[in-house]
Every structure is written in C-alpha cells, then in structure tokens.
Amino acid sequence: MLRPYQQNAVDAAKAFLSKCYDSCIIDAATGAGKSHIIAELAQWIHETSNKRVLCLAPSKELVEQNHGKYIAAGGMASLYSASTGQKSLEHYVVFGTPGTVKNSLERFKNFAAVIVDEAHGITPTIKFIIDDLRAKNPQLRVLGLSATPYRLGSGYIYQLDENDRAISEHETTDPYFKKLVFKIGAKELIDQGYLTPPTTEHHDGYDTTGLELNSMGKFDARQVEKAFEGEGRKTAAIIAEVVELSAGRKGVMIFSATVPHAKEVMQSLPRGNSALVTGETPKAEREQILKAFKARKIKYLVNVSVLTTGFDAS
C-alpha cells in the first residue's frame, strides 16, 4: 500500500498523463520511496494502454532496486541491462539502463511510456531512446522522477511548476520536461514522520578553507587531495568519534573524498565489520559487499562517489 503522499504523486501524474502527451516530472525528496511510485505508475500505464512500459535508471543498482519493488508489489517485469546479465523483453514492463537499451532499440516496439528515474541526469542517450520510441508511437508518454530536478548551469528541468507558473528564462535554459505535477520535500517528510530528523556533528580535524568550487560546481581534485589525504591522525580521531556515536546503529555509510582518503578511513574502522567500495571495485565483489551491508553482516560501508544516487540500504 502506498503512503498518502505517494498516492497523491501517482494521482497527479495520472491526471496529467491522461489528458495530454506532454512530458511531466515528480519532485520527491530522497527517502520518499520513488521506486514505489514508479511501480504503481508503470502498472497503471500498462493496464490502461495494453502496451509496454520502459523504466530507465542510470545504474545497475537502481535498475535492480526499482525492478525489485515492482516484483514485490505483485507485478511481473523484465530486466534489460548488460550489467545485470539480463536482456529480456519477456514482460510488458521493462527495467533497463540507457546504454544497453540504446544498443538494442530495434527490439523495443509497442511502448506506451518511458519512466526516467533520477531525471535530473537526463542524457543525450535517454533523449535518443525517447525520440526513437516516440517515432514508433507518437502518443508516447514520458514521466521523470527526481529529488533534485535542477541542473547546475541550466537551472530547473521543467517549464511549468506545480501551480502552472512558467519558469522564467533566468531560472532555466531549455528544460526537457513540460510540467512539474507533484512536489514533496524532505522537511514535509520529516514533519509527517516518514524521515528521521538529521543530526549533525562538527569536527575540527580537516582544514577545508582552501576548497573552492570550479565552474562545474565541483571542488578541485587537487585541493580535495591536499585537504583530506595524508592526515592519518586526524582521520583516525574523526573515525573513532564516528564509531563511538554510532554504537547503537545497525549500519553506517561513510563517504570519503578520494580513494587514498577512504583507505585511511578503513584503517581506523573495526576489521571484519567494514568494507570499501570504489569505482574500481570489481562488479561481483561490489555486489557481494552491498548484499552483506544490507543483510547487516557488516556495519560500516565506505565509498568514494559510488553510492551517491538512489541507493537503498534497506
């Protein structure tokens, strides 16, 4: 059963998609359960159109997560992603990664809709897929979901907000989606008891005064290295405090600045109860580590720019 706000999001999307062919987007904060919203809408679109539905996500983990929620809700769906080892179109609802789908578009026919998870990261590949499927079906519906429907440098990714206010040229450049149909933020979810209020701790260990954002809105890699790497004693003191403060917690995720910094962090964590995932971690090992963390077989999971988007640790 959907939570009330999830049902409201579904209803808003249904109302919009039922009356026009324009694209729309749902803005739901991290932790809102977008996978459940996707599952409900994919099932509804298939049942009302008797056609296929394609659900895209940027990573293997997200594709499997969304697929799993759909199956758990009682539906039947296929996986189409090389990284999962499956390229199936057996069922009407298909969960896939953009790269794998693009390479096999001749197989993708009779689709009623494309649902894009993490839609703020919409790429030329995703647009190419949508254009191809729309050429095959001019009535194709397109729906996006994101916790941050905004791109640095180009602004909001929709033309109209939930109140039909046109987003000005100062706030957006060439937005892909026509309308924001539903929005719920983290504060609302906390106030309603669906998210745990965040608590913060401050440690004076690292000197980050030299860190500055570049033109892409990111920190310079060399400045990050200078601030965080080679500070073994400071790192050890910070991690000791993390271990102490998390004594009653079942799982702890730690986000490190660089791979050398992550290795310093690992040196201060309990051996046998912690693991590290980076972009270089082999797929099989990475999958094994994530399964162990979700199963509470390890408590501390350190990562470097890997588990930053849509990861569900439950």
Regions from the language model: what does each represent?
Residues 36-37, 46-72, 257-260:
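Conserved Walker A/P-loop ATP-binding site and its immediately adjacent core
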Residues 121-198:
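Post-DEXD/H (motif II) to motif III coupling segment of the RecA-like Helicase ATP-binding lobe
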Residues 64, 79-89, 253, 262-265, ...:
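Conserved helicase ATPase core of P-loop NTP-dependent helicases/translocases
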Residues 19-42, 255, 302:
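Walker A/P-loop
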Residues 70-106:
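Inter-Walker segment of RecA-like/P-loop motor cores
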Residues 1-27:
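Conserved pre-motif I regulatory segment
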Residues 175-253:
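Conserved interdomain linker/interface between the two RecA-like ATPase lobes of SF2 helicase motors
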Residues 93-132, 303-305:
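Conserved RecA-like ASCE ATPase "motif II neighborhood" in helicase/translocase motors
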